[in-house]
Every structure is written in structure tokens, then in C-alpha cells.
Amino acid sequence: MEKFLKYEIKVNNEQARANPNYGIFEVGPLESGFVITIGNAMRRVLLSCIPGASVFALSISGAKQEFAAVEGMKEDVTEVVLNFKQLVVKISDLLFEDGEMVEPPLERWPLLTVTAEKAGPVYAKDLECPAGFEVVNKDLYLFSLQTDKKVTVNVYVKQGRGFVTFLENREMINSLGIIATDSNFSPVLHCGYEVQELKTSKQKITDHLTFKIATNGAISAVDAFAMAAKILIEHLNPIVNVNESIKALNIIQEKAEERRVRSFAKQIEELDFTVRTFNCLKRSGIHTLQELLSKSLADIREIRNLGKKSEREIIKKVHELGLKLRS
């Protein structure tokens, strides 16, 4: 079968070091049509399927429900809830197993807590986090106290994917005074791609794909890009595995330079020399094609017990491979 072009990924490492939350990834060359196939699939997965963490509920001392007002607090509870929904939190995979921070019993939930007693603003950096939790956007404004008064806010955070409404989150809550919120788990804020057509020859037109990805800091753009591809691959692998012969099929065309490097690494056993020629080469310390090509014709003629017939065989084999001995 005609093989598909092998493409490359270019990552702007300098830009990634300056701002890991934003990434530009160049993919190409791709055969015509594949830019839309890959671009759309990657974009959909990046925007909806990358796992993350989000606030799903909170409790405020002195407030029984979201339409209340708390004495001494500048904002009403609805405004405070909207501010807390913008929290970006990372949960360590090292401390929590898969699914552990999705639906544990509410009474055992690790809480992010802030207690304010003095008049003034309160920010995300003031939150006390349990082990394994980290607030990313520490400068996020949460609320202000207009007078000296003790107010405590407990924040419930869980892992998930996509978007979950407060109605769905409320089903987990069986306690008065805990206010459910909407949850946006996706750490990817923006993902777009651009297509550039490249004419590589009279008959061949290839496309170039450029992804631009921005995240909220809970995951780097590079990690999100790789994670999206991993999710797609894991979903497609079972389909490939339906047919073992197809599974083993190589459909991507190697570049000429890669084929050249791979052929150089061939053992001389793979070159189908006659026994006499093979033994002479082995005894002289030549084990790979690369070692053979490093020899000149004069070097070959000096190999002990190597006759004219074997010499001609070596020259012919090298020519068949489109190569030549050292001059």
C-alpha cells in the first residue's frame, strides 16, 4: 500500500519556558484532508476531555443559602460564590488514587478553608489547603469584610472533566448550609488551529497545522497537547486490535535520512552474504553495514582469506543498497 507521510512536531521551547500556560505547536507536513481530521479531533478533546479540578460547593459561616447576605461582608453570597468559582486548583496524583477525589463521602472531604477576622480584602492566597491541594491563581480576589468580624469559608473541590451544573452537584450534598456551584473542570481556556497549504511538488500538495493552546495553569500547554493525543489513541486502539495483521501494518513512510540511519545499523547477518564472505567479515571485526561502509576497497582486499568472488559479492551488495564503500 502507498504509505502516508511522516510528520514532525515543532514546539516553541523558548516561548514555553517564558509562559508554560501558552503553547504553539506546528504539525506537518500532513497529506491533504488530515489537517481537518486531526485538528478538529484534537481541539474537541482539548476543550472538553482534559481532566482537571474545580470548586463544586462551599459553606459560608452565617449563610444558609446563596441568596443570603452575611453581616460585615461587602458582597452578597451570590457574588462570593461567583468569585470562588474562578479558583484554579491542582490536586496531586501522587496523594490521591484515580477516582478518589471524584465522589468521596462529603463528611470526609478535604477542605480548603479561609478565616477572615479583620476588615479588608481576602484573596485566594489566604486559603489554607490540605496536603495534595494547590491554589494556582493566588491573586484571585474572593471577598472583603467591611468591619472586624469572623467569617469562615470552607471550599469543596473535586476532580472531573467538562462542565457540571450546580443542580448535578447539589445531588451530592445532604447538608443545609452547603451551597452547590457549577463546576468547569477543563484546564484548557482556548484552543485554535490554523491551516497552511504547502505545494511540495507538481503532483503533491501537503498541509501544515499550527495549534495555539492556552491553559489556566493547572496543566501546561505541552502536557495538555500530549494528553489530548493520548486520549484519542487509547480510544482508537481497540478498533485497530480487531485485526492483528492490520495492527502490525506500518502505514507511515519513513524519511530517507531515517531509512539511511536504520540501514546503517543492520547486522551483516541481515545482508544475505554467502557463508565464506560472512565468516571473513566477522573474523576481521566487521559486524554492521556501517562498519563495512567505513572500509575502502583497498581495506576489503586486505581481509584475510577473502577472494575475488567475495570481493565482487560485497561490492554488488553495497551497490544494491544504493551505497558505496569509503573512497
From Swiss-Prot:
UniProt-listed InterPro entries: DNA-dir_RNA_pol_insert, DNA-dir_RNA_pol_RpoA/D/Rpb3, DNA-dir_RpoA, RBP11-like, RNAP_asu_C, RNApol_insert_sf
Region (Alpha C-terminal domain (alpha-CTD)): 260-327
GO molecular function: DNA binding; DNA-directed RNA polymerase activity; protein dimerization activity
Keyword DNA-binding attributed: no
Disulfide bonds: none
Catalytic reaction equation(s): RNA(n) + a ribonucleoside 5'-triphosphate = RNA(n+1) + diphosphate
First-level EC class: transferase
Region (Alpha N-terminal domain (alpha-NTD)), start-end ranges: 1-243
A Pfam family recorded for this sequence: RNA_pol_A_CTD
Any Gene Ontology biological process: DNA-templated transcription
Keywords: DNA-directed RNA polymerase, Nucleotidyltransferase, Transcription, Transferase
Cellular component, GO, one term: cytoplasm
EC number: 2.7.7.6
Main function: DNA-dependent RNA polymerase catalyzes the transcription of DNA into RNA using the four ribonucleoside triphosphates as substrates.
Record note on quaternary structure: Homodimer. The RNAP catalytic core consists of 2 alpha, 1 beta, 1 beta' and 1 omega subunit. When a sigma factor is associated with the core the holoenzyme is formed, which can initiate transcription.
Similarity comment: Belongs to the RNA polymerase alpha chain family.
Domain free text: The N-terminal domain is essential for RNAP assembly and basal transcription, whereas the C-terminal domain is involved in interaction with transcriptional regulators and with upstream promoter elements.
Protein name as annotated: DNA-directed RNA polymerase subunit alpha
